[in-house]
């Protein structure tokens, strides 16, 4: 039986330690999986989330991100709250409503980055209806799905514009614009960039449509934000910061080259009309992302007084069980620096 010399024994221990270190090192660079749900189908604006995946921005942040389509902001909020998804993209009013109506629910999602600084909600009518201003909506028949953001926020719009009684008709989303074209209703509410192009697809010329955007008529609600489940946020704060960094880089890519962004959407859902979705994306950027309010507040951030006003307006309009605490639904501490979030300096193609 041989006895190892102290020098040889030390060398073997060091070699073993080195080998173990090499074997263990991949664990330190392991990617954090993130399941993310959009608010809607894969349409033009989805490029904002598909770009950082395709461009490798999330990978560079050590994240393994999967993006799934949604079927409405309310559903996305609920699925993030249930833990089915870690993060999502949803209308801030829907998040506020969930908080106020489910005060004891565990894992309530929190908004960590504002993407649509101005709500895309709008009233749309055909010019031949004679509707030109909000006042013309008095006594008219309006239509929208019951969960539509514009319909739910209608009391805020009506109060701001002195509109009295209107009659509402509910329908599934695919029938909204069809019923307007048929004359079953006088006007609809919907996201401007969605309904305008849906009307065009049904043979209506853009110049024959009247669009009354909520933000242009006294309703300065925030739109869609990135939300995170409370549990995921507490367990993975650095991953959330990394996600927002990667996402912001992707937004800059899409602003610089919207056509390339839509190509990524087409790769994910081959049945889309790329030209139509390019227009939808550009409309969304102009109406909700690259806005004067977003420039003033900083992309991704919110204004405290404006957020508080919205919380009060939503609580009244939605008749929530409890009042809404804006501090409970918003956490801006995970945002990248203001310099990194300056998307307005991005050159466009």
How should each PLM-predicted stretch be described?
Residues 23-29:
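Sec/Tat signal peptide C-region and signal peptidase I cleavage site
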Residues 30-182, 186-193, 212-214, 219-220:
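Short, glycine-/small- and polar/acidic-enriched structural segments
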Residues 92-93, 102, 175-178, 182-274:
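Pocket-lining segment of extracytoplasmic ligand-binding domains
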Residues 307-349:
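Conserved C-terminal helix/tail region of periplasmic/extracytoplasmic solute-binding proteins
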Residues 165-168, 206-209, 271-283, 320-329:
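Short, surface-exposed acidic
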Residues 68, 111, 168, 254-265, ...:
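Surface-exposed patches in mature extracellular/periplasmic domains of secreted proteins
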Residues 2-14:
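Bacterial N-terminal signal peptides that target proteins for export
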């Amino acid at each position: 039986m041989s006895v190892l010399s102290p020098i040889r024994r030390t060398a073997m221990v060091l070699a073993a330690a080195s080998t173990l270190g090499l074997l263990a090192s991949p664990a330190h660079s392991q990617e954090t999986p993130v399941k993310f749900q959009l608010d809607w189908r894969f349409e033009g604006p989805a490029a904002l989330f598909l770009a950082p995946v395709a461009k490798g921005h999330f990978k560079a942040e050590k994240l393994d991100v999967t993006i799934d389509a949604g079927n409405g902001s309310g559903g996305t909020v609920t699925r993030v709250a249930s833990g089915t998804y870690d993060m999502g993209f949803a209308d801030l009013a829907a998040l506020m409503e969930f908080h106020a109506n489910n005060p004891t629910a565990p894992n309530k999602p929190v908004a960590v980055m504002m993407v649509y600084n101005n709500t895309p909600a709008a009233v749309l009518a055909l010019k031949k209806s004679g509707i030109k201003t909000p006042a013309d909506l008095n006594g008219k028949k309006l239509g929208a799905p019951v969960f539509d953001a514009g319909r739910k926020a209608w009391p805020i719009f009506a109060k701001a514009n002195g509109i009295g009684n209107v009659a509402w008709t509910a329908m599934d989303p695919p029938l909204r614009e069809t019923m307007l074209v048929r004359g079953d209703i006088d006007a609809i509410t919907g996201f401007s960039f969605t309904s305008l192009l849906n009307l065009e697809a049904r043979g209506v010329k853009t110049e024959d449509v009247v669009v009354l955007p909520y933000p242009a008529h006294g309703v300065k609600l925030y739109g869609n934000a990135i939300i995170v489940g409370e549990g995921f946020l507490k367990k993975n704060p650095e991953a959330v910061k990394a996600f927002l960094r990667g996402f912001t880089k992707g937004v800059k890519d899409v602003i610089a080259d919207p056509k390339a962004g839509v190509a990524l959407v087409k790769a994910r859902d081959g049945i889309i009309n790329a030209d139509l979705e390019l227009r939808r994306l550009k409309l969304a950027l102009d109406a909700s992302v690259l806005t004067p309010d977003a420039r003033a507040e900083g992309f991704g951030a919110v204004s405290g007084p404006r957020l508080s006003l919205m919380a009060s307006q939503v609580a009244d309009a939605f008749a929530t069980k409890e009042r809404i605490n804006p501090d409970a639904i918003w956490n801006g501490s995970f945002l990248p620096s203001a310099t990194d979030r300056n998307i307005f300096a991005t050159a466009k193609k």
